[in-house]
């Protein structure tokens, strides 16, 4: 079936790196199409890279263009509930995302990962280990390189990180293995509630051969009503069943069906959440027919991703930890649960809270020798959580205030539990700024 047979006009909604990748892909593979781009921002990112012959409308919607479209490719940041998108859907016109276009074009096996937390680390490590096992692999999607740009590479396997937003507009993605890591409250400004959010995540199993789910979080299991009879489930968790953790030779080991694989202490990654992440990677590789034992040396030397519990400065016995990727409550909870701090912890929280309830942090914070530093648009929401809470406007103000007090054994940690869009372009920019300040004051 030629999916493009009746499509003559395509409107791409939202520019940026994803929108540009869509335009490049369409020009290369479907040069006969008329492609137009709408971005409601007055000066969208990437506008200078758009080919001059592509029609562009900025600053508002262009209903006339949408009314003429045979296909609309929307950015994951734009909700399907947006009235202009609903009008398109009511006309019976397909609204897809870049991942759906990737699914139409990909001709090699695909592994995909979703979940509220840990998906970037799992995606990256799966790719690193697959390559170490001799399987040429490309990593992308919601992490780093847009999925469509991966099609330019000569590879044997694709590994994609997928957000719930991307899954909403994806219906044809066939996967050799799919993982749903965990579910915790996030994006409640976009979804009707937790079940709505969960249903978006569960779409990852729609055309998957193997599903990797979390024994410690039953919400990750697909419902039988989804009709995925052919889906083979593989589980991971903190006990010793399937992919899990067992006691061996007097210490904790990662295991498969109660057979030891690797001692937990051999991992460079810190925290219990990262042990779970590694188990998922081992499960995904197994599902894809890759012998993970060939990649264990790569696993042992893997230090994790930038902006994820990353030590950016360590001077005079004071550690500065950049966990800017912690854009929700559960990420910050995970970072704190695996923490080893000899002195006082100076914890920086705040930003764009996305309508979340942060009160579950209170019992964890109560156990720590802590100075809670609250900044950004929703910093006030953290003030009732600890007696030490102090309010600041910007991250720079926090560092300037605390730096004279720091002593050997202390830790300064940015794990904001919030999105960055109130003061930064993204979590990377926020983390980079923190790293700059750390180097300046360390």
Curated annotation (Swiss-Prot):
GO molecular function terms attached to this record: ATP binding; UDP-N-acetylmuramoylalanine-D-glutamate ligase activity
The keyword Phosphoprotein is assigned to this record: no
Name the UniProt record assigns to this protein: UDP-N-acetylmuramoylalanine--D-glutamate ligase
EC number: 6.3.2.9
Catalysis: reaction(s): UDP-N-acetyl-alpha-D-muramoyl-L-alanine + D-glutamate + ATP = UDP-N-acetyl-alpha-D-muramoyl-L-alanyl-D-glutamate + ADP + phosphate + H(+)
Annotated GO CC locations: cytoplasm
Pfam families xrefs: Mur_ligase_C, Mur_ligase_M, MurD-like_N
Top EC group: ligase
Domain of life of the organism encoding this protein: Bacteria
Gene3D superfamilies xrefs: Mur ligase, C-terminal domain, Mur-like, catalytic domain, NAD(P)-binding Rossmann-like Domain
Residues binding ATP, per UniProt: 115-121
The entry's keywords: ATP-binding, Cell cycle, Cell division, Cell shape, Cell wall biogenesis/degradation, Cytoplasm, Ligase, Nucleotide-binding, Peptidoglycan synthesis
Pathway given in the UniProt record: Cell wall biogenesis; peptidoglycan biosynthesis
Family: Belongs to the MurCDEF family.
Record function comment: Cell wall formation. Catalyzes the addition of glutamate to the nucleotide precursor UDP-N-acetylmuramoyl-L-alanine (UMA).
Compartments where found: Cytoplasm
GO BP: cell division; cell wall organization; peptidoglycan biosynthetic process; regulation of cell shape
Residue ranges the record marks as coiled coil: none
Keyword DNA-binding (UniProt): no
């Amino acid at each position: 079936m030629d999916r493009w047979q009746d499509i003559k006009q395509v409107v791409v909604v939202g520019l940026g790196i994803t929108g540009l990748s869509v335009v490049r892909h369409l020009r290369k593979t479907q040069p006969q199409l008329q492609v137009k781009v709408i971005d409601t921002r007055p000066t969208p990112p990437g506008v200078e890279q758009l080919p001059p012959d592509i029609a562009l409308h900025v600053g508002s919607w262009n209903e006339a263009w949408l009314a003429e479209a045979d296909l609309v490719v929307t950015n994951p940041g734009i909700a399907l509930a947006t009235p202009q998108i609903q009008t398109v859907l009511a006309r019976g016109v397909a609204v897809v995302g870049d991942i759906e276009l990737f699914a139409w074009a990909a001709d090699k096996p695909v592994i995909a990962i979703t979940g509220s937390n840990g998906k970037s680390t799992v995606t990256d490590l799966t790719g690193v280990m697959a390559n170490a096992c001799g399987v040429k692999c490309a990593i992308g999607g919601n992490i780093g390189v847009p999925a469509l740009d991966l099609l330019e590479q000569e590879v044997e396997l694709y590994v994609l990180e997928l957000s719930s937003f991307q899954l909403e507009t994806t219906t044809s993605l066939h996967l050799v293995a799919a993982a749903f890591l965990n579910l915790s409250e996030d994006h409640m400004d976009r979804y009707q509630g937790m079940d709505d959010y969960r249903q978006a995540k569960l779409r990852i199993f729609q055309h998957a051969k193997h599903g990797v789910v979390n024994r410690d979080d039953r919400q990750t299991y697909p419902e039988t009503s989804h009709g995925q009879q052919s889906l083979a489930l593989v589980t991971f968790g903190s006990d010793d069943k399937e992919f899990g953790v067992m006691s061996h030779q007097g210490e904790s080991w990662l295991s498969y069906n109660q057979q030891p694989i690797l001692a937990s202490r051999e991992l460079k990654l810190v925290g219990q959440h990262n042990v779970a992440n590694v188990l998922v990677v081992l499960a995904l590789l197994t599902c894809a027919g890759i012998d993970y034992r060939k990649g264990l040396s790569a696993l042992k030397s893997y230090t994790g991703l930038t902006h994820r519990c990353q030590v950016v400065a360590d001077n005079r016995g004071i550690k500065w930890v950049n966990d800017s990727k912690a854009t929700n409550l559960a990420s910050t909870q995970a970072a704190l649960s695996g923490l080893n701090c000899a002195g006082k912890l100076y914890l920086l929280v705040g930003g764009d809270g996305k309508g979340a309830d942060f009160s579950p942090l209170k019992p964890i914070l109560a156990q720590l020798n802590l100075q809670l530093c609250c900044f950004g648009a929703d910093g006030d929401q953290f003030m009732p959580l600890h007696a030490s809470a102090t309010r600041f406007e910007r991250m720079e103000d926090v560092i300037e205030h605390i730096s004279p007090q720091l002593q050997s054994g202390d830790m300064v940690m940015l794990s904001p539990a919030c999105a960055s869009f109130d003061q930064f372009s993204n979590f990377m920019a926020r983390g980079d700024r923190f790293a700059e300040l750390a180097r300046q004051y360390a």
